[in-house]
Amino acid sequence: HHAFKHSGLSYVQLPVGLQKIDEWAFEGCKQLRNVSIPAQTQIGAGVFYNCSALQNVTLPSNITTIPFMAFSACSSLEGVYLTGSTVPNRDAYCFDNVSAAVQYYVKPSALMAYKSSWNDVADRITDEIPVTLTSTKMTFSRGFDVDFTNASGLEAKVVTDYRENGAQLEYAKIEKAPANTGLILTGRQGTYIVKMCDNEPNSVATNLLKASVGGAWVENTTTEVTNYICVNGNF
């Protein structure tokens, strides 16, 4: 319990296969901004209590109950991404003292079930997820499967090959990206609407991009390979 209480963590990348985050683990981590909880991971009571800078959190589909005070006093919370088709129960005070403007994002097929079950926040439950391009090309990744099918003017691409000289890339367009896939988005600057996938996303087995939520250590496996760091679409 209280493993990282009041620490100065600004980001955390939780490993796939993590079984549980214990009670009050990140209590009072006031610089933590975004969290994506891996599939099949359970969370304990008060796990992100008083993380006052936390803006976005992605909850996996196996979460059947959002525990007591899990996100209480997360006063900067803007978006909760609920990836499950089954509506989870809410224990007491799980979203107590959060912003009245927080949005709850769900799959299109689950929209009406969430609105009916969570009727006290029904006006803030939506399946329309805004994505803002601040330049005509930028990097992108999310902790849930993303459907770009109806985002007119916005293209999502994986990188399938590259030429060493000048880091020239070969792209492949996809419409449905798996969670945590590194992507390049292209389009005019502005805000587009994407959705969570209701069915299986495209395969990205050939994608060379690796997503990172924060700092990352990159190490060559051989002396003949150059690694490139891509930030906002540029190397």
Residue map of PLM features:
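Extracytoplasmic/secreted cell-surface and envelope-processing proteins
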Residues: 89-91, 112-115, 192-193
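Extracellular/surface-exposed low-complexity segments
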Residues: 101-128
